[in-house]
Amino acid sequence: MPTTDSSSTADPAGGTVAARHDHRTTRPKENIMRSPLNRRLFLTGTVGAAAALGLAACGGGGDDEPEVADVDTADFPEGSTMAALADAGRITIGTKFDQPLFGQAGPDGDPVGFDVEIGKILAGALGIEAGNIDWVETVSANREPFIENGQVDLVVATYTINDTRKEVVDFAGPYYVAGQALMVLVDNEDITGEDSLAGKKVASVEGSTPAQYILDNHPDADLVNFDTYSNCVTALINGQVDVVTTDNVILAGFVESDPDNLKLVNDGETFTDEPYGVGLAKGDDDFRTFLNDTLEAAYEDGSWAAA
C-alpha cells in the first residue's frame, strides 16, 4: 500500500487528518499495458460507462451465474495454485462490501457488484461454483496484508495497480480502467476541480491511491482519511468534510444511490488513470498468467460485458 513519511492526527470529523508534506511532488503516471483488452477498457472507463455498468452490477450480473468450467486437477500443472484450488473446489476472494456498483453487501450478506462478478468468472474457470466462493470483506488498507498472509487467494476490490503495491503483491489485468474524480453535495458550487481544493477538507480512504495523490499533489488541502468510502460519504453528508475523492466509477455509484444529496464535480472529470487489477501472491507467475488469460477470454466471449 502507498506509504508516506508524514504523520497523522485525529480529527473531529471521525477520520484521520494526514500531515502535510513540506514539498510538492507529482505522482508518476501508471505504466499501463496497452493490449487490445486494456485499450477497450480504457475507452469504457467513464462515468457514463459506470452508470451503465451499475445497472447490471448492482443486480449481481442478472439471474445467470458465470459459466463454470468442467475441469480436472490434472488439467493444471502439478503443484500449481490452479490445481490446488480446483482440487479443493473452493476459493477465498477479498472484495469491498460498501461500494455501490462494484462490491456491496446484498440482503443475504453476500456482496454483489462488478468486482464480485469478475471473481465468479475467475472461480468458474477453475471449476468452482459461485456458492463455493468464500467472500472476505476488504478495505483499502488491508488488501496487501490479506494477500501476503494467505487470508485470501485473490483480491478483486477496485484495486489500482501501481509500482508500490507490486513490490509486495502481483496483479493480473487490468480488467477496468477508472480515473480519480471528486464528489460534493449538490448545492456546492465552490469546488470546480482539483485546482480548487486549497483549504478544503478532502475525504478519502487510508492506503488508497487517491489519498496518496492528494498528499503528493495538493499539500494545501486538508486530507482526512477514513477506513471506507461509505464513511467518507457519511462525513460529507454530515458537513464534516467538503469533498470526497476516489475513482469516478466508485463515486458514480454513490451518486446513483443518493442523487438528491450528491453530485460529481464536472460530471466526473478525471485527473488520473486507475487501472483495476486482481491481486495475488507475489511470484505466482503461473497463476497470474492463468488469470490474465481468463480475463482476456471473458472480454472476448462477452461474459465481461454481462458481469
What spans do the regions from the language model cover?
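N-terminal secretory signal peptides and thylakoid transit peptides that target proteins
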Residues: 32-49
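C-terminal motif of bacterial Sec signal peptides marking the signal peptidase cleavage site
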Residues: 55-57
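Extended ligand-binding regions for polar small-molecule ligands
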Residues: 59, 68-73, 116, 125, ...
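Extracytoplasmic small-molecule ligand-binding "clamshell" domains
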Residues: 71-155
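Short helix-initiation/N-cap motifs at beta->coil->alpha
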Residues: 133-145, 189-190, 206, 224-234, ...
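Acidic, polar ligand-binding/catalytic clefts
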Residues: 133-196
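A ligand-binding cleft/hinge motif common to bilobed small-molecule-binding domains
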Residues: 142, 158-167, 215, 237, ...
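Periplasmic-binding protein-like
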Residues: 176-184, 252-293
